[in-house]
Structure formats: C-alpha cells, structure tokens
C-alpha cells in the first residue's frame, strides 16, 4: 500500500523497543504513520507519513535476523495491509489474521496462556497473550476449513467488520454458513 506517500516500499525500522506497561513487543505497526503529521498531531502523536513497521532488534527478545523475525515481520505487515483496506476492523479479527500470517511463516506464537484461560471470549479483546493465541487457533481453523490462505485474504478484503466481515467472506467464498453455525 502506498496511499499516503506514493512509494510502494515498506520501511522496516529495527530498534530496541522499550517495554510498554510491562510488556516488551517483538514489533508493532503504528496507524499514525498512515496519516499526515498535521493529522497525527491532533491526536498528540507524530507521523513518518510512510508505510513503516517497527521491529525489535534486542537479541534478548527475538533474533533480529532469525526465522522467528520473519514471522514477526509478516504479523506486522498484515496489520499494515489490513489497515489500508479496513481501518475500522475489530482488533480480534485483525490480530487473528496477523497471527495466522505467523503460522504461514512457520513460527507462530507458542500455544501458552490459552489453556489457563479457556473461558476467554474470542470477540472480546483485552490484549492478553491468551487473546492472541485464541485468535491464532480460530483463524487457523477457518483457513483449514474454508480454503486456506485465500480465505483469510478474503476476510482481510472485506470492509465489513467483526463477525459480519467473516460471514461476508464465507458467502463470497461460496459457503452458506454463518458464524453461529
């Protein structure tokens, strides 16, 4: 996507990422880079006015040149792509698609956290590790049942959000099933 700067390149910015509220991230996408500096400042933020992903180069977190970092890059790139198509998507769907991107690259998040939280709601996003794992499992299931990566791409392409977006992707892919089935 090159909507803002007309440059098809994506900048991968490697830096030592400080912790946020006690959590250290392997990478992140900032939607503020997708608007002008003037717009970002109205939110008290700044914009690089380009397609940019931030990746942690602290080897204590993840090897910045190792195969796991490719999965992190795929995860963050999915956020960038999804934002350009559907900036109002619910977090649980966007994160589920991003977690699925990590599965495709062979280094998904470990399946920890979810077994200790089996009552964790799929569509209620609290940014807990169990939320990420749960959406990873659910979107991997959707992929396996309804057409692989092409189906996940269809979900990303839908401009309707949340459950309705998944149902619309099912219909667009020729499945006569709804979310509650």
Region roles according to the model:
Residues 62, 87, 127-128, 144, ...:
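Generic alpha-helical structural element
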